[in-house]
From Swiss-Prot:
Protein name: Structural protein VP1
Source organism superkingdom: Viruses
Record-level Gene Ontology MF annotations: peptidase activity
Keywords: Capsid protein, Outer capsid protein, Virion
Domain PPPDE: start-end pairs: 1006-1222
Active site as annotated: 1040, 1192
GO CC terms: viral outer capsid
Classification via InterPro entries: PPPDE_dom
Pfam families recorded: Peptidase_C97
Localisation per UniProt entry: Virion
Length: 1237
């Protein structure tokens, strides 16, 4: 046995150690040197017709192929070394969480299961004796932990001296002749406990022998481990005797497909004959034998397919000793049909058993000399082991992982489109200086420049004063804000993907144009000169020295008198471009030779090429999060590399405004002192395709006066945040209209009209996108491909962390995220505390009144007095449940739950019911006189209905459930309870909230609709909730009303939060091209989702980013429909969109503005079931509009009442009501757990 183990260890070490070229060379040479011996051994064991005997030379060739493809040696080593020796736990996504719990908690798939494998039928057997046997094997630490945790706690204790690390399998067989039944009792003992017991009754068989095999010790086991051999007792069958052997093997999956066989009861006898058999030579194989069973009936039955030594349910007959040897040979033949590592291990063990333990029997059969048999047996065992493992290697080389040479000659004209973000210059500076003194040459010699036009007429309006004016415009943007890395898809096939990863840079934009004429105005009749400066801002601050106040009244529209264009060769360019080709199927890094790639493409409006010829290996994470192996190189050639990609226009405005006759001025003292002014203004410059935001302009001026010479410097700087819409930076000096002639003023007016309508074209202000016209790639790649025949878990094992570590980290991250969320909730507690008190006060009193009313009948003064007393005594106590729950979110109990119970079914149930049990039960116990209530069937607990229970806010859910379920009781005792306030919630809560909005009527003229709206809603925000509730029940206000449904949910993949904002109203925007407007009929609704990317530190309000329209479930046609039905009042400030992405950006931005600008009248929480019903209600679209009896305000009032637990609105038809119930029921059946409901 020790020598056999040594051989096994030798072969495994020879194979599984990280194979270097020298080791593989030695192994190949050894196989080639033993080729003759292996051929003889194969012929001896498997017969002359066996394919193994003829494949020895091909095996050597395969090994040489391994050497030729030196990359395959790493793949083979990784594959073999990646076979785990312990059970693995697979990583499960959110959708498979139930499967995960089943795999972890359910004992049945994990505890060992045992089956009888093969039954050898033969002649009537007599005297079958009872027998016992046992098999023991060691357990790993992981297996010990699993079994100890999952074994039944009531397991019987067995007095056994074995160690805890050993599992003992016992089988006791007894034959009941009267019943013709052979009974086998199988037991499993570990850690001195009986953890498994199974009784097998085998009826109708005259059993000669049977075998047992352990299937798997854990459901995720993925390894074939070396077999352990156990001898079964001999069974006497008349004059024949057979020694059978069982192999205890661990396997991964067991086929459940049955194979046909004959029932033993129908067999009378079996005749085995040989075709052309020559018993003298001993050269017989299973192919030469035929079996002819004689049946007692025509009944065919199915016996489960067996696993183990025979791998088939072959019927074997035993007539004498020689025949049993040939039967053994038949088993060998069956083995030759095995594949992979299983075949190698079993063949090796079979050879060792045959040649070491039974060599005398073999010698007697094949007449081998006794003196050489032992050495031959040992040598044969070694060579057989090498042969089996060589087969395994050859199989891997052929079917599993192999480095291949791919000669690529790609020349694709398939076009690929990528959309890029706007590109904004990092640093731009302009200096414009003009100096004019008394007596200088006429100004007409230094004319204005206006987009190439000469304006000599300006000279007529200039005064004789001397002014030196310097205009400086600076635009500075952080490098990491714009021009970030992009990925451009160029080509994709079944095998590889070609990508470009550009990084953009900007020229140093410094452009000077001299001279730019500056003009001044001098009133000779006054003692001081007036100068006019307009920086497009509005401020009123004193100078730093306090001599003179600087005043600029209001803001005015700027218009250009000079437009400065940055030349095309001084704008955006590529700083670097990476050429990336990734393989879809490679399981190891790839390399290549003689590679060249080129892309012909448009970037913005410029077309050119980029090419690369030097590549290195890399790893790339694609958009789906999968790791790909590939090659990357920097583009070093091509016409696009140094080309200007986008012309950037910056305007310098000098003089003029739409009302040129208007005089604005800044006055300051002529005293020779220095003054400083500064101020800020908010400028918004919309640009198509950009992300909605704005920049802040800061201006400062420095003025000094010496000897009637004015030096004025104006500096404008732009400070940008994360995203901008600013497209232009300018400085402007203003000329009083009186200083210019009528002709000049008329000309400026014309130019103003022209430039006021002239905006930057989109393609000039930004790089709209990239279009790949042609992709060229050629060269040789060495790719190590995988195959579908190898489980994906093998590759995962090679490229990812241990699954158990991933699960632990996932749990830790989840706990951290939940704790962060709970801390987030702390800032809400102060806001919600009053609302919680209101709910508890109402519900507590409601329950008490209901209980007293049941005893005393109608409400009487006695009942009222008793209610007030009880209410006062229990008011403070009722808040304890919520306070405990709030504290539990961040204190030790929360951490204990997350740390010890998350991931188990028990822990999930505890956490799901934590908020509901703590809050709702606490209130209900007090309401019902300390008798725990029974929740009625059909009511829905949001904790059970919401999948994302871990990161949801349990306080809000409990609050909403209670309010919706029992809120009706408050109305029923309204005559008793004097406090009729309702719950107040804001639109920034995480759970489902319905809010009613009102806005001015768009069909009325602007002054009238604003006036009526103010009069109608005046002072409403200061009224209490009951007054607002009464206000919305009056449905004849001169306003338009709509409602929103808002809630948060958690993204399972990222753990981030997402806000859903659904708008609903009569005649509101919709994705179905339904008519809109204040008087149109039909229910319009649409939904926008936002990713919550943070919380404002000062206000606690959520900072959100729109989700792409495809992720919101819309088609392109539906997006355009929503955009067209938005209404001019919501998109009047937006430029016309060019693409569907632009339209969706306008929709998201306008939707967000709606909830900020329109007036929110009242809000209420809504339970999960009613929110689902409202979703179906909105899909009906039908509404019988009537200005007086059934208008938009009736619609929102009905929606609000239904959200608060009221009846279905009257405008909903009966068939829609029925469909609502069915839709909600189906949804609950899909997502809800009704345990305990």
């Amino acid at each position: 046995m020790e020598q056999r183990q040594y051989i096994l260890d030798l072969v495994r070490r020879e194979l599984t150690d990280t194979p270097q070229t020298q080791d593989l060379q030695k192994l190949t040479e050894r196989i080639i040197s033993l080729e003759k011996t292996i051929t003889q051994l194969g012929t001896l064991l498997l017969g002359p017709n066996s394919t193994t005997a003829h494949e020895v030379s091909s095996l050597a060739t395969a090994m040489q192929k391994v050497l030729y493809y030196n990359r395959a040696k790493a793949a083979i080593s990784d594959f073999i070394m990646a076979i785990p020796r312990y059970p693995l736990y697979s990583y499960y996504g959110n959708d498979d969480i139930d499967d995960y719990h089943l795999a972890v908690v359910n004992r049945k798939p994990i505890l060992p299961q045992f089956r009888y494998l093969g039954l050898m039928f033969g002649k009537p057997a007599t005297g079958i004796q009872p027998y016992n046997f046992e098999v023991s094997f060691n357990l790993s630490k992981v297996e010990q932990t699993l079994i100890s945790e999952l074994a039944p706690t009531e397991s019987q204790v067995i007095e056994d001296m074995r160690r805890d690390s050993t599992m003992l399998l016992k089988a006791e067989g007894r034959y009941d002749k009267s019943l013709n039944v052979f009974t086998v009792l199988i037991t499993i003992i570990t850690s001195n406990k009986l953890i498994y017991s199974q009784r097998l009754n085998i009826p109708g068989h005259r059993v000669a022998s049977f075998e047992l095999m352990i299937i798997a010790n854990a459901v995720h086991t993925t390894v074939f481990e070396p077999a352990k051999v156990t001898k079964l007792p001999s069974c006497e069958l008349g004059t024949s005797s057979i020694m059978s052997t069982t192999f205890e093997i661990r396997v991964q999956d067991m086929s459940t497909l049955p194979s046909p066989a004959f029932h033993a009861r129908t067999i009378q006898s079996i005749k085995k004959t040989w075709r052309n058999a020559d018993f003298s030579t001993g050269q017989l194989s299973a192919e030469d034998a035929t079996y002819e069973p004689k049946m007692s009936g025509a009944e065919d039955v199915v016996i489960p397919h067996v696993y183990g030594l025979a791998e088939s349910c072959e019927i074997l007959t035993i007539s004498d000793v020689y025949e049993s040897v040939y039967n053994f040979e038949s088993l060998c033949y069956c083995y030759s049909k095995k594949s992979g590592m299983e075949m190698a291990v079993r063949m090796m063990m079979l050879a060792l058993e045959l040649m070491r333990d039974d060599y005398k029997q073999v010698n007697s059969i094949y007449d081998v000399d006794h003196q050489t048999s032992e050495s031959v047996g040992i040598l044969a065992g070694i060579t057989e082991g090498l042969l089996a493992n060589a087969k395994a290697i050859a199989l891997l080389v052929k079917h599993a992982v192999l480095s291949e040479e791919l000669q690529i000659n790609l020349n694709s004209i398939e076009q690929s489109y990528s959309r890029l973000v706007p590109l904004v210059p990092i640093y731009v500076t302009f200096d414009h200086v003009g100096t004019y003194s008394k007596g200088d040459a006429p100004i007409r010699d230094e004319p204005f420049s206006l987009t190439g036009l000469q304006l000599p007429m300006f000279a007529e309006g200039l005064s004789n004063s001397t002014i030196k004016t310097k205009f400086k415009s600076t635009w500075s943007v952080e490098p990491n804000v714009f021009g970030a890395d992009h990925t451009i898809d160029c080509y994709e096939s079944d095998d590889f993907i070609v990508l470009l990863k550009p990084k953009f840079a900007y020229w140093d934009h410094r452009y000077s144009h001299q001279p730019v004429s500056a003009v001044s105005y001098s009133d000779r009749g006054k003692s001081r000169t007036s100068y006019v400066l307009d920086c497009a801002s509005s401020y009123n601050e004193e100078s730093s020295l306090g001599y003179t106040s600087l005043f600029l009244a209001g803001r005015k529209a700027a218009s250009p008198c000079a437009l400065v264009n940055i030349p095309l060769n001084r704008s955006v360019k590529f700083e670097s471009v990476s050429f990336l080709i990734t393989s879809k199927r490679s399981v190891l890094p790839i390399s290549g030779e003689n590679l060249f790639g080129e892309i012909d493409m448009y970037i913005g409006r410029v077309r050119g090429t980029l090419n690369c010829n030097k590549f290195t290996s890399t790893e790339y994470i694609d958009r789906d999060g999968y790791k790909r192996y590939g090659l990357i190189g920097k583009c070093t050639g091509g016409s696009l590399l140094n080309a200007s990609l986008s012309p950037l226009w910056v305007r310098l405005f000098c003089g003029g405004h739409k009302n040129a006759d208007q005089i604005r001025f800044i006055g300051f003292s002529r005293t020779p002192v220095v003054g400083t002014l500064s101020g800020e203004s908010l400028e918004v410059y919309p640009m198509p395709g950009s992300i909605g935001s704005s920049g802040t302009l800061s201006q400062s001026g420095r003025m000094s006066i010496y000897n009637d010479v004015t030096s004025l410097e104006v500096t404008l700087s732009v400070r940008h945040e994360a995203s901008l819409e600013t497209a232009n930076v300018y400085a402007q000096s203003e000329i009083p209209g009186a200083a210019l002639s009528t002709e000049i003023r008329d000309y400026i007016r014309q130019q103003n009209l022209y430039y006021s309508d002239l905006g930057l074209r989109e393609e000039e202000a930004m790089i709209q996108g990239a279009v790949v016209m042609r992709t060229t790639f050629r060269g040789k790649l060495y790719v190590t491909k995988g195959t579908d025949s190898i489980p994906q878990s093998v590759y995962v094992w090679n490229t990812q962390l241990n699954d158990l570590a991933v699960a632990v980290k996932m749990t830790a991250d989840l706990a951290n995220a939940a704790e962060i969320r709970s801390k987030e909730n702390q800032f809400r507690l102060n806001e919600m505390e009053q609302a919680v008190r209101e709910i508890e006060n109402q519900l507590l009193l409601s329950g008490i009144i209901d209980g007293l009313a049941a005893l005393t009948g109608p409400a009487t003064p006695v009942v009222k007095k008793a209610a007030s007393l009880v209410f006062g005594a229990m008011k403070n106590m009722s808040r304890s449940g919520f306070r405990i729950l709030a504290a539990g979110l961040t204190n030790s109990y929360f951490k204990t739950v997350m740390t010890h119970f998350l991931g188990t079914r028990k822990g999930v149930e505890v956490w799901r019911g934590l908020g509901s049990a703590c809050a709702e039960s606490s209130v209900m116990i007090k309401m019902s006189g300390k008798t725990k209530p029974i929740v009625k069937e059909g009511s829905t607990d949001l904790f059970l209905a919401d999948k994302n229970f871990i990161l949801a806010d349990p306080i809000e859910f409990a609050k909403h459930n209670i309010s919706t379920k029992y809120g009706g009781n408050v109305e029923q005792i309204g005559n008793v309870v004097s406090d009729s306030e309702r719950l107040a919630v804001g639109g920034d809560l995480g759970s489902h909230v319905v809010t009613v909005f009102h806005r001015p009527l768009s069909i009325l003229p602007e002054p009238l609709r604003t006036l009526l709206f103010k009069l109608s809603t005046s002072g409403l925000s200061k009224r209490d909730l009951s007054a607002r509730e009464a206000w919305i029940r009056q449905t004849l206000h001169p306003t338009h009303s709509y409602a929103t449904i808002s809630y948060d949910y958690v993204l399972p993949k990222t753990g981030g939060n997402r806000r859903v904002l659904c708008f609903a109203g009569v005649g509101d925007p919709n994705p179905y091209n339904l008519p809109t407007g204040d008087k149109n009929v039909g229910i319009g609704s649409y939904m926008v989702e936002f990713d919550i990317i943070g919380l404002d530190k000062d206000t606690g309000v959520k900072v959100m980013r729109p989700v792409p329209w495809k992720q919101c479930g819309y088609t392109e046609e539906q997006v355009w429909s929503i955009y067209k039905t938005l209404g001019k009042e919501y998109r009047k400030v937006e430029l016309k969109p060019y693409t569907v992405e632009d339209a969706w950006r306008v929709i998201a931005k306008s939707s967000h503005k709606r909830v900020l600008s329109d007036k929110a009248i009242i809000s209420t929480p809504i339970s999960y079931e009613r929110q689902r019903a409202i979703e179906y209600m909105l899909s009906s679209h039908g509404f019988d509009y009537n200005l007086v009896l059934n208008n938009c305000q009736d619609f929102t009032r009905g929606l609000f009442d239904y959200a608060r637990g009221g009846p279905v609105p009257d405008f909903i038809e009966n068939d829609v009501r029925i469909a609502m119930i069915h839709s909600t029921s189906r949804h609950f059946a899909e997502v809800c757990s009704w345990v305990g409901v």
